[in-house]
Structures are given as structure tokens and as C-alpha cells.
Amino acid sequence: MEQSEILRYQPAEKTNPYPAVAWTLLLAVLLSGGALLAMEHLWATEVLPLMRVFAIAIVTVVCCAAGKCNRRLSFLWIVPLLFVFITTGFRGCPSGGMAWINDMLSRWNSLHEDGLALFSCNASLRDRAAFASLMAVLTGLLAWQIAAGRRLYCGSAFCLFWLILSLLGGGFFPPAFVLLLTSVFGMMLSDHAQGISGRGMVWCGGIAIVLCLC
């Protein structure tokens, strides 16, 4: 009598998700940092310390990463948004946004001797700071979605948007686009699980160095 074979199934080896999440977090920080650098150079005056704007965006990205690692913390992405709404009241954000657009239009008019109409607004420094804080949170959220989903077309369009805006507004700042392009190249070198090999990291670092030297 033949003995039936006993098939033993071994569970699939679990992979550590944290390196992939850390890499995604880095890409999102680079992407949001480049966008915020570009935005900061389009203001006529400094409205918030740059490190504070970066800190808001980084905290936002970290909250998104925490939600990715633990589903119970998936609500954390809304915490920075609520914090900005509570501290600013949201009342100054529209005026601050119009003031930011006015700064770009004024620079365009002075560079090209044009007469583009400006928005009628009387924004205070607090209104501008409120808008900058809101933009830091929204930029962090968008950068995380682009990096986590490996959305290369969206990332490229994101970079192109800030490039066109900077050129039209007369506030082109090369380091901002080094960060933006490094993030996009990092997404290109990542696999579908958002991980990256040691060779890919070397390539990404080399590309960043070349962009810095250009």
C-alpha cells in the first residue's frame, strides 16, 4: 500500500517593511523640501523661518509614514492639518495666498515691464505665515502620496509645475530643483515595493552630486 505524501507548506518569509517606508519617507521629504524652497523664493519678504516650514512638512510626512507602518495610526495624517487650522484659524490663508500670487505678479511686471492686474488684498505678515504653514502641510501630504505610490508622472508634473512657476515668477532657485529631481530619480530607481538596492542608492547619490555641480 502506497503511503500518501505529506506536503508541508512553509509560510512565506516576511519582509521587513521599515527600510522601504524609510526610503519612501526620504523621497517625500526631498520632494516637499524642494517645493517649499521654490515657494520660499517666490515671496517678496520672508514670512516664516525656513526651518519652521521644513519642520511642518517633515512632521506631516512622518505622520503619513507612521500610518503606513501601523494601520491603527492611519489617522495621523490629519493631525498637522488640524494643528494649522487651530493655530491660524484659517482666516488668513486666503489673503496670504493672494499676497503670494501678488508677489509673483509684481516681480513679473518689474522684470518684463508688464501691467498684470494684482489682487485687491491687504494681507498681514500673520496671513502670509498662515498660508505658508498650510502649504507646508499640503505639500507634505502630496509629496507622500507621490512617493508612496511611485507616481513618476505625477512627480514629474509636480517638478514641472514648480519650475514653470519659478521661471514666470522670477524666483528660480537651483537647489530647490536639485531636491525635486533627486526625489524623482530616486522613485525611478526604486522597485515596486518601494525598496532600493545599495547600487540604486549609489546611483541616486551620484545623480544628486551631478545636479549640484551643474
Locate predicted features.
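Helix-boundary/low-complexity linker signature
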Residues: 1-214
